[in-house]
């Protein structure tokens, strides 16, 4: 083969004109000019973004958020931390189902009852005083006096009472007096039970004979979860959970310390 000449390979036949795709050119209207936006400072109006983080929330919302964060960050003593251990859903459902039977009467029901009694008296049938039906007793003062007099059969405390100091002493008092107690979610649910907005605590004092077995079963389960575990609960601190920034900073420092130690040891 002579010097300077390159070997030529076989040429591939060009594709037929039918197989070639004809690209249609996009018709651009010259009247429409491109005006790209500049989102720099002091330039175009910014696009809509999620600015939830920068919203100035109402004061009560800010306080709620600060409170919840502080509960996580600070070391929470066992007396307060025990209110995070609410009753399990299944037992709580059974408890509220039973408590629903012993709801106190509303103002309208009381009015109707007294009106019927007054009509009966006016008709000359005589006034026969009716026996007070067994109902759940509500309110921290009422519950406290019933526990102290050992008339309470079961005490139910809300987990989110604010200020918590209102019910802080109740678990210790119940244990001292040998009364079964439990902590449930939340004060609004207890409030609905007794026809109020919120309620700190309720207690059972009397029940009908047909419900005594159900109450005894509940009391047994609740005693196992709360009264019998008191020593364990009083040793368990809460909180002390750092945020992502603090955790990252601590991890960075630990890594630097480890590196320094490794270089020293060689």
Swiss-Prot record:
Keyword Ion transport appears in the UniProt entry: no
Compartment annotation: Cytoplasm
Gene name per UniProt: rpl7a
Organism encoding this protein: Ictalurus punctatus (Channel catfish)
Family to which the UniProt record says this protein belongs: Belongs to the eukaryotic ribosomal protein eL8 family.
Single GO cellular component term: ribonucleoprotein complex
Function recorded in the entry: Component of the large ribosomal subunit. The ribosome is a large ribonucleoprotein complex responsible for the synthesis of proteins in the cell.
Region annotation Disordered: where it falls in the sequence: 1-21
Principal place of residence: cytoplasm
GO biological process terms, semicolon-separated: ribosome biogenesis
UniProtKB keywords: Cytoplasm, Ribonucleoprotein, Ribosomal protein
PROSITE patterns: RIBOSOMAL_L7AE
Full protein name: Large ribosomal subunit protein eL8
Compositional bias (Basic residues): 1-11
Subunit structure: Component of the large ribosomal subunit.
SUPFAM superfamilies the UniProt entry points to: L30e-like
């Amino acid at each position: 083969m002579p010097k300077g000449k390159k070997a030529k390979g076989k040429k591939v036949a060009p594709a037929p004109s039918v197989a070639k795709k004809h690209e249609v050119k996009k018709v651009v209207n010259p009247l429409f000019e491109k005006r790209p936006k500049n989102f720099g400072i002091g330039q175009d109006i910014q696009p809509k973004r999620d600015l939830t983080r920068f919203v100035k929330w109402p004061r009560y919302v800010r306080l709620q958020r600060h409170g919840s964060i502080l509960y996580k960050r600070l070391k929470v003593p066992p007396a307060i931390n025990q209110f995070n251990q609410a009753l399990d859903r299944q037992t709580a459902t059974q408890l509220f189902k039973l408590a629903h039977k012993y709801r106190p009467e509303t103002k309208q029901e009381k009015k109707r009852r007294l009106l019927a009694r007054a009509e009966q008296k006016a008709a000359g049938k005589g006034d026969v005083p009716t026996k007070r039906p067994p109902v759940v007793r509500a309110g921290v003062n009422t519950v406290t006096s019933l526990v102290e007099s050992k008339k309470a059969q079961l005490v139910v405390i809300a987990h989110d009472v604010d200020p918590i100091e209102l019910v802080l002493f109740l678990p210790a008092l119940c244990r001292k007096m040998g009364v079964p107690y439990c902590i449930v979610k939340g004060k609004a649910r207890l409030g609905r039970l007794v026809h109020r907005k919120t309620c700190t605590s309720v207690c059972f004092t009397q029940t009908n004979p047909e419900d005594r077995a159900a109450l005894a079963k509940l009391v047994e389960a609740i005693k196992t979860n709360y009264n019998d575990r008191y020593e364990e609960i009083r040793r368990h601190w809460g909180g002390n959970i750092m945020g992502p920034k603090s955790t990252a900073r601590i991890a960075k420092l630990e890594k630097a310390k480890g590196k320094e130690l490794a270089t020293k040891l060689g």
